[in-house]
Amino acid sequence: MHQHDSSINVNVAVLTVSDTREMEDDQSGDSIVASLEEANHQAVHRSLVSDESDEIATLVSGWAASPEIDAIIVTGGTGPSPRDVTPQAVLPLFADALPGFGELFRQLSYQEIGAAAMLSRADAGWIDVGLLRTPVFLLPGSPKAVELAMGRLIIPQLSHLLTVCRGKKTI
C-alpha cells in the first residue's frame, strides 16, 4: 500500500442537492467546507441545487471540465426516495468507479446507525474530460454522514487519490 501525500492542497467544488435547504442553513455543505479548510484544502466553488437530475449533471460535468477543480463533493439526494436522483444524475458521467468508498462508508455507517446504512447510495468515481481526471464523491445529506465520510474516508485519502489518478507531474 502506498503512503499518501498529505502535502498536496486540493481545490474542491462542493454541491448540495436539496429541495428544502438554502445556502444559509446548509449544515452539510458547511461541514464539508470546514473539513477541507482544516486539512489545508480549498472549496473553490460551492452551489446548491434542487433534486433535478439535469441540473445536477450539468453542474458536475461543467466542474469536471474545469482545470481549476481537482475534486468534486456532492451532498444530498443519495437516499431511496423518488426525489433522490443524485446517483442517477452523476453515475453515468463516471469513467471509472471507486466502489471501495461506498462499501466502506456503509460499513462505517452500520457501526453508528445499524441496518439503516443499507439505504445509502453513497458512491465515488472519476469523470474524465480530455486530460483531466476528476474524482467525485456522492454523500448523503445528513450532517453526521458528511462528518463520517469527510473525517474517516475523504480527507485522509484525498491528496493521495489525486496523486494516483492524475500523476504527480500534473498536480
Which residues fall in each region the model found?
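Glycine-rich phosphate/diphosphate-binding loop of Rossmann-like nucleotide-binding domains
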Residues: 1-51, 55
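A generic local structural motif
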Residues: 1-2, 57-61, 119-122
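Short coil/turn connectors at secondary-structure junctions
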Residues: 9-10, 67-69, 130-134
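Short beta-strand segments
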Residues: 15-18, 74-76, 120, 138-140
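Gly/Ser/Thr-rich loops at beta-strand to alpha-helix junctions
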Residues: 18-22, 78-81, 143-145
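Generic recognition of short, well-ordered alpha-helical segments
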Residues: 26-27, 58, 85, 148-149
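N-terminal small/polar loop signature for handling phosphorylated ligands or for N-terminal nucleophile
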Residues: 33, 37-75, 79-94
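Proline/glycine-rich low-complexity loops and linkers
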Residues: 86-171
